[in-house]
A protein has these predicted regions:
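Dinucleotide-binding Rossmann-like beta1-alpha1 core, especially the glycine-rich loop
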Residues: 81-166
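Glycine-rich Rossmann-fold phosphate-binding loop(s) that bind the pyrophosphate
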Residues: 37-43, 63
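Active-site substrate-recognition segment that forms the wall
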Residues: 76, 118-126, 218, 230-270, ...
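Glycine-rich FAD pyrophosphate-binding loop
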Residues: 50-73
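Short beta-strand to alpha-helix junction loop
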Residues: 101-109, 133-142, 182-202, 211, ...
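Extreme N-terminal leader/targeting segments of oxidoreductases
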Residues: 1-33, 51-57, 456
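Active-site-proximal substrate-binding core of FAD-dependent oxidoreductases
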Residues: 356, 368, 396-431
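Helical element adjacent to the flavin cofactor pocket in flavoenzyme catalytic cores
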Residues: 148-153, 176-234
């Protein structure tokens, strides 16, 4: 059956080159490193491996095409942070190591831009930062506490993260009900599909092999079983993110959650003069049910949000990506935020699956004794962290000393998710509670105790 890959996102539809799949695996083979997953994590790992040791035989195994998953569908936020936040790293290691991880994440945003330039990847990279609005009193208080805490505990300055008053925030994004906001400098907007497709081409040029249309069935020490043959490898890298649950024995490793997006038609200069985002800042507000957007290189708004239900037993179902009522709700949120967009044409509606570990803490690891390596669990914030993860994995695998190989997420192993039906009840219950918390905060102006309690339970 022919798959219409361009229908999977604005970014894939707009990709200027062909999306024809590379050849699948042609039978049993033997390599030095087998990387399972042709998204950011897998390709960054392969890219850095081949730069560190060009003699390595590196094989990337991808079920569909490079960028089919979240790497070709996300919001294009290359942001220097983890979903878990630095407090988690501070608790589990030390303040000093948490600061080092933050610094490495900030640098990874610039590293993505450097590699895009070096490899001539035209992905519309624009480091304009993030504007996160406060649109009720609870959001404003939460932001004020966050900025003060991060500057005090982790040494951030106004050059990294700063509060904006209402006028300053509206000058960046002319939204409704703005009380203030936070500006975070370490973010770039980009076209995610052009980045991941360009990475695939870079891996090809470096001598790596990418086998597409090849489904990995199981992974174990020294071996990957696929539907096109068995791969023997000294090192096996799991880089499957939201699709990890499809591997034998990994149904409870990461839970796949959906995020859905829409894109407007290209907007005229008069509309942009009213909206703002002059530096292509990415944007959001501080609600618990996350929204996120960017001004694309061709003048659209690409805008998304959470809220799609979790499928029982980690079910991945393409029909969830086209739930029209969820897309309609996302459009309502966009117009409520920016009323001047009422009536603009929506040209694309899509969605994708992201990977969530039980403790919301991404990890990178390599067991030299077994040759098993892994990275992921970014909870939807993987564009920049995947670069750091792939770079770190390559250094661990090749035995290269660097300041990255002992960062606090290296070697972390999240506990397994609960079995069904507990998992289904807990995740979908949490989604409902967070939506309720947002409504309560909007009405009362006070931070929701429901949300505070739920965050503690989830993490």
């Amino acid at each position: 059956m022919t798959v219409d890959y361009r229908s999977r996102s604005l970014w894939l539809d707009d990709f200027p080159g062909p999306l024809d799949p590379r050849s699948p695996l042609s039978g049993d083979t033997q390599v030095d490193v087998a990387v399972v997953g042709g998204g950011y994590t897998g390709l960054w790992t392969a890219y850095y491996l081949l730069n560190l040791d060009p003699t390595l035989r590196v094989l990337v195994i991808e079920k569909e095409i490079v960028g089919f998953g979240a790497s070709g569908r996300n919001g294009g936020w290359c942001v220097g942070e983890l979903a878990a936040g630095p407090d988690r790293q501070q608790r589990e290691s030390s303040n000093e190591t948490a600061r080092r991880l933050l610094g490495a994440l900030h640098d990874s945003v610039d590293e993505v831009g450097r590699i895009a330039d070096r490899e001539s990847i035209d992905c519309g990279y624009a480091k304009g930062g993030t504007i996160r609005l406060a649109r009720n009193s609870a959001q404003l208080e939460r932001q004020q506490a966050e900025v003060a805490h991060h500057q005090r505990e982790f040494g951030l300055t106004d050059a990294d993260l700063r509060m904006l008053d209402a006028a300053e925030a509206r000058e960046q994004l002319n939204a409704t009900d703005v009380l203030g906001g936070v500006f975070f400098a370490h973010t770039a907007a980009l076209d995610p599909a052009r980045l991941v497709r360009g990475l695939g081409e870079a891996v090809d040029r470096l001598g790596g092999t990418i086998a597409e249309q090849t489904a990995a069935i199981s992974i174990e020490s020294g071996r990957v079983a696929t539907d096109h043959g068995t791969v023997q490898a000294d090192v096996v890298v799991r880089a499957t993110e939201g699709y990890t649950s499809t591997l034998d024995g990994h149904s409870r490793t990461l839970s796949p959650l959906y995020s859905l997006m829409i894109a407007t038609e290209p907007l005229g200069d008069d509309v942009w003069a009213e909206v703002g985002l002059a530096n292509r800042q990415t944007f959001a507000d501080d609600r618990h049910m996350v929204i996120y957007g960017q001004r694309t290189a061709d003048g659209r708004i690409a805008f998304g949000g959470r809220g799609a239900p979790y499928g029982f037993a980690s079910r991945i179902d393409a029909s969830i990506e086209q739930r029209s009522h969820i897309h309609d709700r996302i459009l309502e949120s966009l117009v409520e935020l920016l009323p001047m967009l009422k009536g603009v044409a929506i040209t694309h509606r899509w969605g994708g699956v992201l990977g969530v570990p039980r403790d919301w803490y991404p990890s990178v690891g390599f067991d030299r004794a077994t040759g098993m390596a892994w990275a992921g669990g970014y909870v939807g914030e993987g564009v920049s962290p995947a670069n750091l993860a792939g770079r770190t994995l390559a250094e661990l695998i090749t035995g290269t000393d660097s300041p990255r190989i002992d960062l606090p997420w290296v070697g972390h192993e999240s506990r397994k998710w609960e079995p069904e039906p507990i998992r289904w009840l807990a995740i979908n219950g949490a989604l409902r509670i967070m939506g309720l918390a947002d409504r309560l905060e909007q009405r009362s102006g006070r931070e929701s105790l429901l949300a505070k309690g739920m965050w503690k339970l989830m993490r």
